[in-house]
C-alpha cells in the first residue's frame, strides 16, 4: 500500500525550528507500506530554520510579518503532485500545521490557540478525494495488549476465530448484559477468544444475537460494551448482507455509512447508556475513513475485489420484499442486513474506531434465499475475507 507521510513525522529535520517530530506509531506504519515523504514548506524553497508560520484570514504569515501564502501554495501543489502521480490514497500529515493540519490549525496569533480549518496541502488533498489523517489517528489506532482489536463476526464468518492464537476464552454467558438464555444460531458460536492474530492482540466474538430474536437493543450491543471494557479502541464488524441490485453486487464490501431502520436504538434504553457519556452521538464518519482506506489498500495489494456502499439495518428476520428493495435502492443503499447498525451506534458512543466489512452473499430480495444459502455463499469468500482481515490487522 502506498502512503504519503509528513517528513517531520519520520524524523527528518524539516520543521521551521530545524527539528523533527518523529512519532513511533507513524514510523511503525512506514515500515509496512510504500512511503512517499512530503513537506510542502521545504518543497517551496523556504529555508530551515525559519520563523514559525500560521494562517490568518485565508493567508499564511510568518511571525515576522512576512506573507508566505504563495510559497505555501507552491509547495503544497508540488506535494500534491507527488501524491496524485503515485496513485496514493492515504496521507498522514502533521497535526495543527499551517500546511498539513487536518480540521484544526493555529489561529494566527502565535498563542497556541486552535481554530477549525485545514492546512494548505490538506485542502488540496481532500479536494482530490484522498483520505487525510494526522499522527493522532495513527497513535489512536495502534493496538496493544492493553488495547486489543475487537472482531464481531456474523453468519458463516466465525471461522476467523480459528486464526487466533488463544490466551483466554470467555463464555458469552459471563459477559455483562448478554442474555444468558441465548443459544447460537447455525454459523455462530458463543465463546469469545482473547489472543493474537499474526502477533496483533485481538478479541474475537464469533457470533451475536439479534433484535428479531426478541432481545433488546442493549442486549444486542452488549458485546461491543464488553470489548470496550476490555480496552478495545478499534472494532471490526464482519457480517453477511444482501446486495441491493443496481447499487451493489455480491461479494466482499466495506460499509461507508448506514441507515438504521430497525425502529430502535441502544442509546434510547437505560441499560445501553451505562458506559456512555452522552446519547447525543455524532455519526459523521461513523465508519473510520482511515480504516476504510487501509482495507481498500490491502484489497488492492492482494487483488481482492472490494466494493463499498451504504448499509441499511432492518429488524428482520424475513428477507426483503421486492418493494422494500426498490425503496432501499432509491435511498442509495447498497447492502441490507439485520445486524451491525445498532452495534455501530454503540461503538461510536464509546468512541471506538469502526471498520465494517460485509459479505454480500445474495442479491437482496432474490428468490430462493435461505439462511443455509447465505452460509454456503460465506464459505465461497472465506479465504479472501481472511486475507483481507489479516492484511488490515497487519497495518494497525
Feature names for model-found ranges:
Residues 364-396:
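His/Asp/Glu-rich mid-to-C-terminal helical/loop segments that flank catalytic regions of hydrolases
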Residues 8-13, 60-68, 106, 201-215, ...:
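Short, basic, glycine/proline-bearing loop/turn elements
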Amino acid at each position: 500500500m502506498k502512503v504519503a507521510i509528513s517528513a517531520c513525522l519520520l524524523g527528518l529535520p524539516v520543521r521551521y525550528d530545524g527539528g523533527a517530530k518523529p512519532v513511533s506509531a507513524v514510523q511503525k506504519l512506514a515500515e509496512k507500506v510504500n512511503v512517499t515523504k512530503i513537506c510542502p514548506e521545504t518543497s517551496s524553497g523556504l529555508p530551515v530554520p525559519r520563523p514559525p508560520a500560521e494562517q490568518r484570514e485565508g493567508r499564511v504569515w510568518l511571525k515576522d510579518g512576512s506573507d508566505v501564502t504563495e510559497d505555501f501554495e507552491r509547495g503544497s501543489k508540488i506535494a500534491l503532485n507527488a501524491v496524485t502521480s503515485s496513485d496514493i490514497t492515504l496521507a498522514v500529515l502533521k497535526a495543527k500545521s499551517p500546511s498539513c493540519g487536518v480540521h484544526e490549525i493555529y489561529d494566527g496569533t502565535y498563542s497556541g490557540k486552535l481554530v477549525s480549518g485545514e492546512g494548505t496541502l490538506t485542502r488540496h488533498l481532500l479536494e482530490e478525494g484522498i483520505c487525510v489523517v494526522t499522527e493522532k489517528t495513527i497513535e489512536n489506532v495502534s493496538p496493544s495488549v492493553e488495547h486489543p482489536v475487537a472482531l464481531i463476526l456474523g453468519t458463516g464468518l466465525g471461522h476467523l476465530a480459528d486464526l487466533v492464537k488463544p490466551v483466554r476464552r470467555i463464555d458469552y454467558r459471563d459477559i455483562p448484559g448478554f442474555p444468558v438464555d441465548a443459544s447460537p444460531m447455525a454459523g455462530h458460536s458463543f465463546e469469545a477468544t482473547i489472543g493474537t492474530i499474526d502477533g496483533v492482540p485481538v478479541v474475537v466474538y464469533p457470533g451475536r444475537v439479534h433484535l428479531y430474536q426478541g432481545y433488546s437493543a442493549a442486549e444486542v450491543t452488549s458485546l461491543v460494551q464488553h470489548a470496550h471494557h476490555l480496552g478495545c479502541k478499534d472494532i471490526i464488524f464482519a457480517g453477511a448482507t444482501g446486495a441491493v441490485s443496481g447499487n451493489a453486487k455480491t461479494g466482499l464490501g466495506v460499509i461507508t455509512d448506514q441507515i438504521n431502520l430497525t425502529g430502535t436504538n441502544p442509546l434510547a434504553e437505560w441499560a445501553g447508556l451505562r458506559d456512555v457519556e452522552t446519547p447525543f452521538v455524532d455519526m459523521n464518519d461513523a465508519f473510520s475513513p482511515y480504516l476504510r482506506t487501509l482495507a481498500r489498500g490491502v484489497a488492492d495489494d492482494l487483488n481482492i475485489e472490494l466494493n463499498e456502499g451504504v448499509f441499511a439495518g432492518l429488524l428482520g428476520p424475513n428477507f426483503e420484499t421486492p418493494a422494500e428493495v426498490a425503496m432501499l435502492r432509491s435511498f442509495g443503499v447498497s447492502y441490507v442486513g439485520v445486524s451491525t447498525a445498532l452495534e455501530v451506534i454503540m461503538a461510536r458512543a464509546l468512541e471506538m474506531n469502526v471498520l465494517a466489512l460485509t459479505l454480500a452473499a445474495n442479491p437482496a430480495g432474490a428468490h430462493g434465499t435461505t439462511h443455509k444459502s447465505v452460509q454456503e455463499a460465506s464459505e465461497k469468500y472465506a479465504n479472501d475475507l481472511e486475507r483481507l482481515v489479516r492484511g488490515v490487522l497487519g497495518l494497525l
